[in-house]
């Protein structure tokens, strides 16, 4: 037996107005809001305005830390407010969202996500990354997918542009990685559906990526920003859930293996996840001998200022 659930999502600068309805559908009366410091500053005003005058009680607003480590996960698990809440509202980037999603496994809580940056697809996925205290990769957890995602393009446009930039780099990997991982064929229905949806992931990046990055650098909420946010969060997130099941894993391959390897060896400088993954995509095409896509993706990386060599 296989049961597939996908996150609901609301997109728009007024997305938080849907929050009371979404909570009511879950029968939720009490919430805890957890996220990064900057993320909470960006998202809380809209969330609080949406809940004003409702019977929903905010039990706690908590800064989670700075990384999705066991220590930070434990702080959420051990919070009396998070234990009492019906829904945990996770705000921030991938590390904040993954912290809350992982904590929710033990707490058995529903999670709503508010991606305040779109650096990856964590807001939609039933997988989370867990790091060691030194920043190296510990492994993965497998929470339930978030029940509802609230995507506010204005918040994303006003966040640091480097995260949007890195998010494009990470999203570039989804289509080629899934295509490579499933290349042996003989896919059952859910995996085949994931592959079909993966084919929708790259073109929006090529179409809207450069303009979207320019708009974010000007803190401008635009159609390009919205389309990139939807692609990074929803398209790639849904693909992740369809291509990652108990009996198979097609969600990533060479590009993320390249990233994981860089987390395990000494290296100079600090690099964002998607920045490294975008170079890993070129490694994938070099490995498979796909010259046409290597050249196309490398040209786009150059347009975006993403790396095309290890030196960068």
Residue locations for each model-derived region?
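ATP/NTP phosphate-donor binding region
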Residues: 1-85
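C-terminal charged capping/lid subdomain of soluble metabolic enzymes
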Residues: 2, 17-18, 290-312
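Solvent-exposed alpha-helices and their adjacent loops that cap or buttress functional pockets
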Residues: 2-3, 25-26, 80-83, 104, ...
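A short, small-residue-rich loop immediately preceding and capping a beta-strand
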Residues: 80-103, 107-116
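A glycine/threonine-rich phosphate-anchoring loop and its flanking beta-alpha core
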Residues: 105-198
């Amino acid at each position: 037996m296989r049961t597939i659930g996908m996150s609901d999502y609301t997109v728009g600068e007024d997305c938080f107005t849907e929050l009371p309805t979404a909570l009511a559908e879950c029968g939720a009366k009490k919430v805890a809001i957890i996220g990064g410091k900057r993320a909470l500053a960006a998202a809380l005003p809209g969330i609080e305005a949406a809940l004003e005058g409702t019977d929903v009680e905010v039990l706690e607003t908590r800064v989670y830390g700075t990384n999705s480590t066991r220590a930070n996960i434990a702080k959420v698990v051990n919070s009396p407010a998070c234990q009492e809440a019906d829904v945990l509202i996770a705000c921030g980037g991938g590390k904040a969202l993954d912290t809350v999603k992982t904590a929710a496994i033990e707490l058995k809580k529903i999670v709503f996500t508010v991606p305040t940056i779109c650096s990856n697809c964590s807001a939609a996925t039933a997988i989370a990354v867990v790091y060691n205290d030194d920043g190296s990769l510990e492994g993965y957890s497998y929470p339930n997918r978030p029940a509802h995602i609230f995507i506010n393009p204005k918040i994303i446009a006003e966040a640091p542009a480097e995260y949007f930039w890195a998010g494009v780099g990470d999203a570039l990997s989804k289509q080629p990685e899934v295509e490579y991982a499933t290349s042996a064929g003989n896919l059952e229905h859910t995996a085949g559906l994931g592959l079909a949806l993966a084919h929708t992931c790259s073109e929006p990046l090529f179409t809207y990526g450069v303009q979207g990055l320019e708009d974010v650098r000007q803190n401008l909420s635009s159609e390009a920003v919205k389309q990139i946010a939807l692609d990074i969060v929803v398209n790639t997130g849904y693909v992740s859930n369809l291509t990652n099941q108990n009996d198979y894993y097609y969600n990533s391959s060479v590009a993320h293996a390249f990233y994981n390897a860089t987390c395990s060896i000494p290296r100079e400088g600090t690099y964002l996840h998607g920045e490294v993954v975008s170079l890993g995509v070129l490694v994938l095409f070099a490995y498979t001998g796909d010259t046409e896509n290597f050249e196309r993706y490398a040209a786009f990386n150059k347009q975006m200022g993403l790396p095309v060599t290890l030196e960068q």
